[in-house]
Amino acid sequence: MDELPKTLDGSYERILREIDEEKRPYTYRLFQCLVISTRPLCVKELSELSAILPDAGSTLGFENGWRPENPEEFILSACSPLVTVVKDVRNNDANDGSEEKDNDYNDDDDDNAGDNINDDEDRVVQFSHFSVREYLTSDRIANTAHVSHFHILPKPAHALLARACLGVLLQLDYGLDDAKIRLLPLARYAAEHWVDYARFEDVSSDIQDMMDCLFDSNKPHLAAWLWLCDVENSRSRYQRTPSPTRPDAVPLYYAALCGFRDLSERLLRARPQDVNAWGGYYYTPLLAALHKEHPNIALLLLERGADVESRGRQLQTALYVASSCGYTEVVTLLIDRGANPNAQCDDEDVDVVKWTPLFVALQKGRLEIARILLRHGANVNYQDNFGRGPLHIASHHPSDDLALLLLDHSVDSNASDYWGRTALHEASSKGQIAVVTLFLERGAKVDARSKLGSTPLDEAKRYGHSEVVKLLLDHGADADAQMNDYRTAS
């Protein structure tokens, strides 16, 4: 009897060496998919991925006789005992095992075919142990004779999945419906995740032809992809919706949204007029690129004539979004192109209206952005819909850098909001000792009263900031001052 391996690596090496040679290409592709997949793969999805030819070029190629009668048995025969098949617990989360899950599938109901979740879709494949993944991607297997061909490198694996997903999407057309989707088990997965794989390192350059085909406005694939997947909010449309009938999607908008710079540049060369075209949830390609944190594409669009004053949702300008994200180069270019640093915007993230780029830069702690905005005329004493000025916002940060910047630009340190609260009230209530110290040194009124009669000392005591209490008292705060309800700070 052969001696058993003494280490996990030895065990894995032995298992890999015993895999039938004819199955090794399938096994390797299965391992690649499992290593880099952005979510658990169900049995049928992984079975189909394993059969995709890795060198099929710009089309989707499959091995002859590629679809096995029993996908789970096929996967386990190729990979066991390194992988296992388990119930997909994600399917139990929505309703805690309620009847809705049980009623999703009915073999006899063709009308519900698109909503079915069969056994293969309810079971996912995973490595038997986390160390299997670690071994397959390690230098140890790469340097081990006889099994080094199982070593998985990130870029080829991402390229394989990107090509596979795009190949599936390029089979979609305007007549898409749930019945057709059911015939393509990879369709939903491909729609949701191909961008993740294509964006990895330089993978997109290897699949340029396929991407160009998907984003060709004269072909049906882009509209079909957008019907299948809510790209902007990253939620698959499992609910049935009407099939698309109009190829009205703006390719440049979605290229910018997804972060594909080279593709965006090619689309701009083909249709420069689309640079300001309305595209979807974020309105323009420029705003989509900024919201999705692709500053390199924003710079490209600005160089090609993007409108710097276009507004998106909540009337937000590109300068507002770029200031929020901290994109110094984009902010500078926007201002150089004439963007208004005092344009008023709404922001549901902080439940306000009439904020300017300076406000959001301060709220996010973007010191350099704030400097640029102030240098180009941002109003340091502007008030939002609650009467708060920039200094109120800066006072919430532990560091005094932002507040000092505003004070050096002649901000009114005693300006009050609609409740009569000054920036010193705010800093005291938050316990920001450095900011309170700065305000007192710069002449802030230590006993300023709000409309309720509250002083900074009241705020510090209410929230238990003893250091701030002592500091305020040392600067002459009146401990016996009465609020409007006749309470005192003591």
Predicted region positions:
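Ankyrin-repeat boundary/"N-cap" motif
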Residues: 244-252, 277-285, 311-317, 344-357, ...
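Ankyrin-repeat inter-repeat connecting loop/turn
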Residues: 274-275, 308, 341, 380, ...
